[in-house]
Amino acid sequence: MRQKRKGDLSPAQLMMLTIGDVIKQLIEAHEQGKDIDLNKVKTRTAAKYGLSAQPRLVDIIAAVPPQYRKVLVPKLKAKPIRTASGIAVVAVMCKPHRCPHISFTGNICVYCPGGPDSDFEYSTQSYTGYEPTSMRAIRARYDPYLQTRHRIEQLKQLGHSVDKVEFIVMGGTFMALPEEYRDYFIRNLHDALSGHTSNNIYEAVKYSERSLTKCIGITIETRPDYCMKRHLSDMLTYGCTRLEIGVQSVYEDVARDTNRGHTVKAVCESFHLAKDSGFKVVAHMMPDLPNVGLERDIEQFTEFFENPAFRPDGLKLYPTLVIRGTGLYELWKSGRYKSYSPSDLIELVARILALVPPWTRVYRVQRDIPMPLVSSGVEHGNLRELAFARMKDLGIQCRDVRTREVGIQEIHHKVRPYQVELVRRDYVANGGWETFLSYEDPDQDILIGLLRLRKCSEETFRFELVGGVSIVRELHVYGSVVPVSSRDPTKFQHQGFGMLLMEEAERIAREEHGSGKIAVISGVGTRNYYRKIGYRLQGPYMVKTLE
């Protein structure tokens, strides 16, 4: 039978030939020990077959022969940063609902773009509906089960390991929603991982513990006034381990003028209660708010990191954006508000990043709201990179957790640790004694793993933590995801660093804190890890009596 010439083939057949050719070149490069620029190979090969479009990465990954998957897929992985910290993050959104403080302040925050009453009517509070997470949620009609399944499949297709999943529950103040809806939402997140259909939250958590895809934590976005004792207890039941608290400003006048609906005192109280319950606390902060100015902005971040009443474990930096339909948009249009210039904003972010202590992680430095929706504010989509470049010019460094992580260092600078040692940093925060333990390569400033230990204050309200108890608020070994039961000698997870950090934490709790018991706020899927080293479940915590 006559073989078809290139001109006789359909575009789909030509695309199949292109994908096969790309994979052949990748295999040859691997066998010769050469590095290869995938984008150049895709462009060149597509042109060779007369195609204007390049093959999709998802299709290339799907077509890799089984015997080469182990070596080629990690090289093809799209956006390796997504799992460089050792965890696949799955962001989900709850249904649109009104902001809880409307009932007593009469309005939402002046800068807030979203919500059911906004110009973006099908969006959740503080989102426009055009962010990637929002669009995935809208496609799934805000169904938590579908959002989770779709995102996990998407990450798998892009070559990421999804053995460990951390959920981020976004979409406004989740804890202001009715209890029945909250239970339904969290139950479905756990069920989407375990495959079990649960009748209640306790059953969902029980099955999630034994799931092959481990839920190593849930992060919930909330406000300081929805972070009180009953809210914290509910979140512990869900398997939540980290809180993202909307602070925005440490100035009382700014909180009042922007219609936040809570005081700065409420921020300090929520941090104290949350840390005494074992939660990791991430703060959302907004530089460039009305009536602040550059000097006051720098002062507030100095205060935020140095004052023991604040000192968060993590930071999401969201420079103020002017978006159509907000109160701030009207102020901007009438000339009563003006955003910082691009150069001033880069300078400010650079100086803020230089203030961040080594125990704090900067998760984000800008919102992912599409630029066409922004009337004034951030003009660059790569603000972090521009701030780092400015820091280099100024001769200052960012030493936050994320910048020093081994996985991130490997991706950006191809640097691997050489001389690893235990580093200890002690500080006082929110009424308790904090110890930040880490394994680092001090010469190259690379962080391999960390542990946050707290001697709870006397104000702790959880009965499991009363009377001389120390709590491990976080244990995390960085580097690419390694399944919980396996070892990969080239990756840093499961090389024993976690065990060494736990042993040192137990020693400090026993000998220095004088504690008779140590507790761990553990993600639902990692409880069995602690059972193996002598811990048992008490309420939402894994606990161990210290001899």
UniProtKB/Swiss-Prot annotation:
One of its GO terms (molecular function) is tRNA binding. It comes from the Eukaryota. Tyrosine-phosphorylated; phosphorylation on Tyr-202 does not affect elongator complex integrity or ELP3 protein stability. Also serine/threonine-phosphorylated. SUPFAM superfamilies: Acyl-CoA N-acyltransferases (Nat) (SSF55729), Radical SAM enzymes (SSF102114). The keyword Acyltransferase applies. It holds the Pfam family Radical_SAM. The keyword Membrane does not apply. Belongs to the ELP3 family. Pathway: tRNA modification; 5-methoxycarbonylmethyl-2-thiouridine-tRNA biosynthesis. Residues 82-372 form the Radical SAM core domain. Acetyl-CoA binds at K164, E474, L475, H476, V477, F497, G498, M499, Y530. The gene is ELP3. Coiled coil: none annotated. It is found in: Cytoplasm; Nucleus. One of its GO terms (cellular component) is elongator holoenzyme complex. This is Elongator complex protein 3. It catalyses: uridine(34) in tRNA + acetyl-CoA + S-adenosyl-L-methionine + H2O = 5-(carboxymethyl)uridine(34) in tRNA + 5'-deoxyadenosine + L-methionine + CoA + 2 H(+). InterPro entries: Acyl_CoA_acyltransferase, ELP3, ELP3-like, ELP3-like_N, Elp3/MiaA/NifB-like_rSAM, GNAT_dom, Radical_SAM_C, rSAM. Its EC number is 2.3.1.311. Its cofactor is [4Fe-4S] cluster. PROSITE patterns: GNAT (PS51186), RADICAL_SAM (PS51918). The lineage of its organism: Eukaryota, Metazoa, Chordata, Craniata, Vertebrata. Binds 1 [4Fe-4S] cluster. The cluster is coordinated with 3 cysteines and an exchangeable S-adenosyl-L-methionine.
